[in-house]
């Protein structure tokens, strides 16, 4: 595994590709006009990045997997994620365009508040967005608008207009992803991630105390699927039943409560939606091999 280069701010990236910094918190770059040849390297950014790949660029390591990015592909990276391939000694001229924006740019804005809604910045949506020619034109228009605003110079309107255009680009990306999910079949992994999000959200409410343990039907309803379809999908992808899959996430949450708090087993059982502590203890031991108290004692 090669070295990972960390770039904490926009200026560092601009310097790396020979781009003038027009704004310390945002940049739009035409990589084909980069004045510097690049080496293959794995990088982690301290800012958000959207890359529009204009030509086939081969396999890139994105998170834990490799993806073959084709022409007209959008790649989204959140701060802290890693992208690139290990250095093979070769230099190349980068192609495509990049939009970079620091979290500080959107802090306190509606976009900053809603960034969690753009799930394609996380591993939850682990496919890049493959654009049609018309969609590519829309994205380029958004990038051009941001670039034009940056070249005007910073004034009191700059932040609002730049952030609005970034938000517009991301909202178009949501629309284009919806189209891709309809036309592409490889969405099962995404649904599994959403099931986990539903379960996580369930335990952040009082539903466990008022309703009880999360059911397969509840998760399916939240994802607008039938319980049978969701059960078949999870069984195909994991080899486990939907109930077993949900229960594994429940056990992870239980472990966090056992090790992260001083609450009694009875209190934790009630918080998780079990009617009886004995039932919780049986389920926990079946999955972990130890009772909750034993697990707390050995950790």
Question: Model-flagged regions — what are they?
Answer:
Residues 163, 185-225, 244-263:
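A short, Lys/Arg-enriched amphipathic alpha-helix from helix-turn-helix/homeodomain DNA-binding modules
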Residues 88-154:
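A hydrophobic/aromatic-rich effector-binding and dimerization subdomain
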Residues 236-275, 297-299:
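Terminal helix-turn-helix DNA-binding modules in bacterial transcription factors
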Residues 72, 230, 279-280, 284:
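Short hydrophobic/aromatic patch on the recognition helix
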Residues 1-68:
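Generic protein-terminus/edge-of-domain signal
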């Amino acid at each position: 595994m090669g070295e990972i280069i960390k770039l904490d701010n926009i200026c560092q990236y601009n310097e790396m590709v020979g781009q003038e910094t027009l704004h310390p918190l945002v940049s739009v770059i035409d990589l084909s006009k980069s004045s510097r040849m690049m080496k293959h390297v794995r990088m982690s950014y301290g800012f958000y990045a959207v890359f529009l790949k204009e030509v086939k660029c081969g396999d890139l390591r994105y998170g834990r997997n490799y993806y073959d990015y084709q022409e007209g592909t959008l790649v989204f990276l959140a701060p802290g994620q890693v992208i690139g391939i290990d250095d093979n000694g070769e230099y190349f001229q980068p192609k495509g365009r990049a939009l970079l924006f620091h979290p500080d740019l959107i802090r306190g804005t509606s976009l900053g508040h809603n960034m969690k809604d753009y799930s394609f910045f996380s591993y939850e949506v682990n496919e890049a967005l493959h654009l049609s020619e018309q969609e590519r034109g829309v994205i380029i228009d958004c990038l051009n608008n941001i670039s034009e605003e940056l070249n005007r110079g910073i004034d009191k309107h700059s932040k609002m207009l730049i952030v609005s255009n970034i938000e517009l680009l991301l909202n178009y990306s949501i629309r284009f992803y919806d189209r891709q999910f309809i036309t592409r079949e490889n969405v099962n992994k995404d649904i599994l991630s959403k099931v986990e999000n539903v379960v996580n959200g369930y335990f952040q409410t009082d539903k466990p105390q008022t309703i009880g343990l999360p059911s397969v039907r509840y998760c399916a309803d939240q994802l607008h699927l039938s319980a049978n379809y969701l059960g078949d999908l999870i069984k195909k992808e994991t080899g486990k039943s939907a109930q077993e899959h949900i229960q594994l996430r429940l056990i992870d949450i239980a472990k966090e409560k056992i090790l992260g708090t001083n609450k009694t087993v009875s209190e934790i059982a009630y918080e998780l939606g079990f009617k009886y502590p004995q039932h919780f203890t049986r389920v926990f031991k079946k999955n972990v091999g130890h009772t909750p108290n034993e697990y707390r004692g050995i950790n």
